[in-house]
């Protein structure tokens, strides 16, 4: 005989009914996430090439407190939208997007780099500063996207090429990209100009 399932704990029940404090989207909450980000981020000069300052989010994601604040900050912003799916961009967008999707109770769609998925796929090519790249998502109706509202999440907005291509990819598949969220923006590269007709949320500015 299969044993009966234990009763759901009060703590588990409580987590389903979030308080107004959990949903707080005040400037103070946003500053807390940005502050935690600045305390943990690893700054690497001259990487990947001389003159470039690389801001590595790995220590931020590895620290449970900082990661929690970051995810809650992004999730609280997402609550302003009617979202069916979070689109996480390859690769750190997978980590952030999955956690945000879990927080919101929605699914996660991995937007993969070209060549990582079996056919059939929706595919888009886009230009980089020194070449081209591609993105893909499944195209066999395993993930119905027609009319779905998708919010895209990535770690950094630089030139805007990857986010712009991701939007094109999803819209070609019938989805509606309703907004974008990133942890850092390199404002000097003017990436937001390529995305100016979409709501964009940035946790903090790079540099």
From Swiss-Prot:
Pathway: Purine metabolism; AMP biosynthesis via salvage pathway; AMP from adenine: step 1/1
Catalytic reactions on record: AMP + diphosphate = 5-phospho-alpha-D-ribose 1-diphosphate + adenine
Gene Ontology terms for molecular function: adenine binding; adenine phosphoribosyltransferase activity; AMP binding
Ranges where the record places region Disordered: 1-33
Gene3D superfamilies according to UniProt: 3.40.50.2020
Record-linked HAMAP family: Aden_phosphoribosyltr
Function: Catalyzes a salvage reaction resulting in the formation of AMP, that is energically less costly than de novo synthesis.
Protein name as catalogued: Adenine phosphoribosyltransferase
